[in-house]
Design a protein with these regions (language model features):
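N-terminal pre-domain/capping segments
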Residues: 1-67, 71, 75-90
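Active-site acidic/histidine proton-transfer and metal-coordination neighborhood
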Residues: 73-153
Length: 153
């Protein structure tokens, strides 16, 4: 078993690795951007290189990111669904650039209909995302939820 924590990327994504080392972490989770916004500023190529270098030097693994809390792959609202899929592809792009094992995501909240229908929407959205990025090594990591109404996972 490896123990890690979610670390801030304030000052650059590579700083999260340094913070993890200070706290004795063996694994790491980060947000690659503000988790309460749809889009983030592009990752600095120099920071990407430094992050990858620091991960390799420290042996911290696995390193993962957590997707924006705004993403809802279970929604039946077309505009929100499209925005969620686009945002999730962006999350995967960022994680792939950083060499992360995966992106942790809350699958979504059922906004209408049966939970089974919402689960199909989630699966369909993940298929769309993988079709958009078929060669990526970064995995989608579904985070379970408990006792949060119609939140699925």
């Amino acid at each position: 078993m490896r123990i890690g924590a979610h670390m801030s990327i304030a000052g650059g994504v590579s700083k999260a690795v340094d913070r993890a080392v200070v706290h004795g972490c063996e694994a790491l989770q980060i947000f690659t951007k503000n988790a309460s916004q749809w889009r983030g500023k592009p990752l600095d190529p120099a920071e990407i290189r430094l992050f990858r270098q620091r991960i390799e030097q420290t042996g911290i693994a696995p390193a993962v990111s957590h997707a924006s809390y705004l993403i809802n792959l279970a929604t039946t609202f077309p505009v929100l669904r499209e925005q969620s899929i686009v945002a999730f592809v962006d999350e995967l792009d960022r994680a792939e650039a950083l060499g992360l094992l995966g992106v942790v995501i809350h699958p979504g909240t059922c906004t209408a209909g049966a939970d089974e229908d919402a689960l199909r929407l989630i699966a369909d959205a993940i298929r769309v995302v993988y079709k958009a990025r078929p060669r990526y090594k970064t995995m989608v990591l579904l985070e379970h939820t408990a006792g949060q109404g119609r939140t699925l996972g």
